């Protein structure tokens, strides 16, 4: 029999996260800051904002159709300052970096399908049919019972480590740290249950006059130990802190960053499948973003209601059509009812048309920049609409009625 996550006596899984100062994450935050600024003034704007950052230069580009005006260079510098790139010795800072913009309007060919869906063109009058999907593609959502936030443990811990790394920099606990950084966690599973942490990896950018030994001791004490549960650590857990021995040059000085380069960091750390579309800089008519959020919302509520311990949902769309082409689920042999019944519950309680998703989750609001670092999903410290468990009671009631009818 093949060895799988659920039946293997020893199964290692690794996920990574990055800090807000990572070059790719700088770009995600800038793109979402532009989106938030526009959607706050014009909720129906169409935004596809991409950012590139390199040594001394930020380029913001994309397709934006809106009735409002925002000062993009000012937004860019504000994000860079908030992240912590404020010192010239970093080689990149908010005051001296160049900012270039190249913005066009959304293609009229795309607007034909988004502004008026195929269903609306055929004469149907349901207002939720009016908005077509902004592109073709497939989107995935996932939830599991490993953590209180229904996320896989490896990515949950990796995000918390990266966030802690930024916290100890900003609050002065480890004032020698610089904004760039990464984390990686390997969890050892036994028959589908997390048993121990096999290894923890931290990359922390730092000032040049700090010894490797001090950094390693400080990071283990101030970052790793406060985050990783002690019952998952043992004498064989391996710690790697700045494994090359030095991480002074970082951020856009050492690596060019782009929006959308950290799609697994943004989602489930590789634990679930991914359709390939990025989130940041996209308004909610782009199903790459809104349908992934909705799929997470569905999966989380279904798992919280007890339908399965692990559940992945796939939704697929075609550009200009409101209704999804397909909806499918995978429960990894943990379901407590048939897949047919689960799909009927999804159909009963969740409307997957883009306009319905936007309205039900309240997505035409400036809520996106806060998601652009440390994950779009899970995030118990944020009140994200796709993380709410407000469908659990209704799902349980339907489960009971289905059981009675059989």
Curated annotation (Swiss-Prot):
Keywords: ATP-binding, Cytoplasm, Magnesium, Metal-binding, Nucleotide-binding, One-carbon metabolism, Potassium, Transferase. ATP binds at residues 22, 180-182, 246-247, 255, 261-262, 278, 282. Pfam families: S-AdoMet_synt_C, S-AdoMet_synt_M, S-AdoMet_synt_N. L-methionine binds at residues 63, 106, 255, 286. Its EC number is 2.5.1.6. It is found in: Cytoplasm. It is an enzyme of class 2 (transferase). Its main location: cytoplasm. HAMAP family: S_AdoMet_synth1. This is S-adenosylmethionine synthase. It comes from Dehalococcoides mccartyi (strain ATCC BAA-2266 / KCTC 15142 / 195).
